[in-house]
């Protein structure tokens, strides 16, 4: 059990999930947090002046050693990634993420860290199982025989193996969560790295602001995904990290409710109070046809399931992005 003064290290803390995770622990009275990201501090989405905020590039051994020094728990959420447009166009950048986990897990082991969390992804699953929109939920065992998403998916799958072998050979307690489309406030919403929920919110906001009646939709609108709100994700991370039955055992962390891209747009339009025309772009990056999470294992093991509906989560996300959009329009400095 963590004590108030135990040092927690969170990498990727200048980003979406990492920044929200820092706030999650801080709000629960765990104040000894070392927050790490390679971005300049003024570009972090969330930043607490009461935590140790370090700008470090965790693709290097030296930075990882400095980050892990004295830590009891390490949450490795650092990654060079984005939405499907980024993942498909910049596979080399995504693959370089393996340097982060390689150096972080070794640094954690050398520093005597008790628990190490690795943020994996549903992109590790075989693309051959994701060729239909009405897809069945993916079980943890479906990852083999392997045919992961090119670049990003393979990097994460290999890093999962590192976590499993550090437990088997060196006794480091590692925990692996396969995230399924996390969304919410304080995340990237433009610039090419944003994911579908944020991108659609922004497109609708722009259309309303410019009196346009049309938004571009990547793909045909029929591709499907499940979407997990950030608050549900944070609770799941905490539960996974502190369950010894899950040491070195990958587990899905996501919603099992499937939505098409068109249904996602329908939800955002209702929140905005508009109805827009859709210009479909089948040649744009679209990823697999369908992907969903089978949550049988996490329900049986932890009793966890998401409790935030897509409508509620999207409403909070939409209004946060709208505020950011309007602030930027006024020339104010905002997260991006």
What are these regions (language model features)?
Residues 30-40:
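Conserved glycine-rich Rossmann-like NAD(P)H-binding loop of the short-chain dehydrogenase/reductase
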Residues 206-336:
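C-terminal substrate-binding subdomain of Rossmann-fold SDR/epimerase-dehydratase oxidoreductases
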